[in-house]
Amino acid sequence: MARKNVIIALLIFLVAGQTLTAQRGGGGQGAQAAAPATPDVPIVGLAGVAFRVSDLTKARAYYQGVLGLAEAFSTKDQSGRVGSVYFKINDEQYVELVPDMKPGELRRQARVMFQSSDLKKLHAIYTERGLAPTPITTGPDGNPVFRLLGPSGAKLDFIEYVPGSQQGQLRGKLLDSRRISTHLWHVGIYTEDRAASAPFYGEKLGLPRGRDVGRGEYIETPNSDSNTETKYPKLDPNNPATRAQFERESMGAVEHMALEVTDMKATRDLVQDRGKYTDLWVRAHVGNNRHWLMHLFDPDGSRAEIMETAIQPDSIPSLSVMLPGKAVGPPILPKEPRVIPWP
């Protein structure tokens, strides 16, 4: 039944049409030193996001080879098997890969991590608000952590970095110049009923606007997303032969991360060369949020939304496409409402 509800929520929007843009968000690379989101909740910002993968070798080629994120450390279970691998974005933020994805599985996001400046205080606040945080324990990375289950089964972990932890030992290290981005700007968390979940993220977690987490970072809570437009050939949601694949690709677009960049064209050209991608796979367009956007996908379909810091002028309307290829020129402007003009 739960899977059926997930699929229904995804298809309500997807079949009706395309919304090829992210929600508008604030902040940027220059905003990372900002104060916590709200004074009475000691949340500093996003600590990272974990994606499930089916093949670590292929995943490494993407996260390290294409995105340029240095492999920082790994954790192992009691049997000695790799439990997760961390890739470093900056001293405060990591992407974690969990190698347990099975063929045909729908959900890829393993957890979303929030950084706290006072984990014990945060735990007490959430307990007083009627939430059910797990006890604070020491995670495999050496940091204290507790978990809350959010709407639609979202796994939300709250951590506090401490000296001697894996992240603490790597502070100031592995800041690879090959990184396409030095800032995780936002994370998309699948939420079946956005209206019903709003009080949880706003009133219970204490996030301003139900999304802001500090340092200019934020969460999105979509129940559908059609940002699969760089996957060709496009899949027909009404075709029984490809319906399951369509659902998986749609969920991979929903459960996403957004990386901030300062120069979209330079970034697009770089990842195209690294990944040997076609022009279609690195198409960049202006979103409704007025930022240049590009959507990349890991080998298991999890989306990385690449978003330029600058807001574009009105002369470059939403859905305008950056001129493909290495040539420099004006963008391709849309001719029809809600239709990307290229290809």
Where are the model-predicted features located?
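Bacterial N-terminal signal peptides that target proteins for export
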Residues: 1-8
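Conserved short beta-strand elements that form part of the metal-binding/catalytic scaffold
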Residues: 33-37, 70-107, 155-163, 208-251, ...
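Core segments of cupin and vicinal oxygen chelate
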Residues: 41-94, 128, 141-147, 188-236, ...
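Vicinal oxygen chelate
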Residues: 23-42, 44-54, 85-87, 101-180, 211-214, 218, ...
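Extracellular/luminal Pro/Thr/Ser-rich low-complexity repeat and linker "mucin-like" segments
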Residues: 197-202, 244, 342-343
